[in-house]
Every structure is written in structure tokens, then in C-alpha cells.
Amino acid sequence: SVVEKIRALGGEWAALDDAIQARGFLDLVSRITGIPDLLYDPWYFGGGTHENREGQDLDPHVDFNRHPVERWHRRLNLIVYLNPEWQDAWGGSLQLHSDPRAPDDRVSLVTPLYNRCVIFETTETSWHGFSRIALPPERRDLSRRSVALYFYTRERPAEELADTHSTIYVNRPLPGHLQAGHVLTDADVAQLHIAVARRDQHNERLYKDLSRLNAQLEQATAALHAGRLGRLRYFARRVLARFQGSFMIGPG
């Protein structure tokens, strides 16, 4: 679950919201990262409090690269973990990938322990995610909790520029033991069902994105036709039709 409007939670959350938008804090993060003129996101798009439970995971991905409203460049992820107790063996540890599409993908793990802060740049290669949470039966009351803060700039270096995009996911590969001749176990079948369902979810998300873009294109086209240029095109088509009609041969 996600709560983007953390200020509405009151108390310490409101104090956190005050702290991260203060110029002193933004300048400190700029000094640490070398990225000047950082901007706080008052909308917390995609950020805020995050909580994940047993069986959940997050496929490797790079984040959306422009602010949906301000069109700022997204530059930094800052994640603070809120878990007094966690082990890598339970899954859910942050995975930083070199390239999840590559056979030799290198993965670094960060255990999501309480008060641990991770800062990394948001680029076209900042692949990250976390593996499926599989808690021991006696610890199923636990959840993976964090607060995610994203920071922006009005400009970014030319060599880092890319077309505007939403979050880009890469589906996890099938387990290495699933080879020809292997007899599927119940666990294997369950894992295959999960993999297929995940791909279906990504396809559905892409179809929705395409439908939304098509609707926006249709609205823009309608607005253009309704304007002066649209009226000129309409009259031009009428004149052309009459001109062509004058040379048509009538029925015999």
C-alpha cells in the first residue's frame, strides 16, 4: 500500500514533510550527490509511505523520468527503511541491477533495516526492485515498510536526456533449474502461474497507456479541427470537392 499525502498523517510525518522541503536539507543532499538546485515534490508522485507484505515483490525497473505536472527532470530517489527486524533470506531486500536484461546482470543487495537510508540517481540505467517476500510462518505479522522521497531539477545534463517515459519494467527470468527434462513440482507450477500473471499485468498496463495516449491524440485533433486551422481545412476540402466534381462524368 502507498500513502502519497504523508503530511495528512500528521505528527512526525508533517515534521518530515517540513524538513525535506527546507532549503538547508535540499542543499545538503545536493552536496552529497553533486546534483545542484534540487526541487522538492509537493505531490509525492509515486512516493510517500510504502508497505509490502508476504508474497509481494517488485520487478526490476527504471522510474518515470519527468514530473507528471511540472515536467521537471526526476533526479534522485531517497528511501528510508522502517523495519526494526529484517533478513535477506526473507526476500524483500532492495536489489540494484547492472542490467536485468543481460545474462551477466550483477545485483547488489541492501537489507531494508530501520533508519537505513539509500540514495541513488534516477537515470535510464538505475534498475532496481526487490524479490518476493517469503517470511517464516511465525513472522508473517511483519511487513516491509519504507518512505520514498523523490527529488527533481528543472534541467539535467544533455548526455542524460531521454524521451519522456513512464516506469519501465523488466520481467524476471524463469528460474535456472527449469530446463528440458525437469519434472515440474507444485512449487514450479505456482511460480510459472505467477510469471504469466505478471506478464499479463504489464501488458494490461501498456494497453491502458496506449488507450490513454490515443484518447489524448483524438482530443488534440478535435481541438485543432475546431480551431481556425481546422475551419480553413474544412473549406479547402469543400472547394477541392467542388472542383473535382465539375470534371466528373455523369451517368450515361
Report the location of each language-model feature.
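Helical coiled-coil/dimerization "stalks"
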Residues: 211-252
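Non-heme Fe(II)/2-oxoglutarate
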Residues: 1-32
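Short acidic (Asp/Glu) patches
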Residues: 11, 32-33, 59-66
